[in-house]
Amino acid sequence: HAFRTLLRRSRLARLTAPLSVLPETARLDVERLPVANLRLLGRVLASHGVSILVCGAAAPGPALDAADRVWFDYDAAAHWQNTWMNWAAARRTVDLLNEGLESLCHSEGWRWVPVHEHITGGTGVFRDLCHLHQHAIRWKAEIIADALVAAGGTARR
């Protein structure tokens, strides 16, 4: 435990092996918070006849050029203000979230929209680790609208 704690505080370790210093609790945190809350909300809504469609979370990457990687690492350190978060760790956390959401959709029979498979890129698409530029928000909306139409719904464009 002491060695892992030391690694979490090491900038060299974060830059060279970021996934090895991501806290082991990340998967459990994803299951306990967003996935569990969405499961509860979705079940309540479904019990009232609401059809459920869940879209994945997009994140920068999967491959970034050096300048984008520097920007997203800086952004992670500046905004998250902890010793283990950088672009690779944030990307892994989003991947864990998407895995949890997709699994939830399959187990509950809900429609899954993997927007993260379509929305990729660097600073031309993402303002930071979490937020899209306006053109990418429209892109995401089109992906969701297409999924709604494919599910038998309607979408106004």
Question: Where are the language model's segments positioned?
Answer:
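Acidic carboxylate-rich catalytic motifs and surrounding loops in phosphoryl-/glycosyl-chemistry enzymes
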Residues: 114-119
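Sec-exported extracytoplasmic/periplasmic mature domains
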Residues: 43-47, 106, 145-153
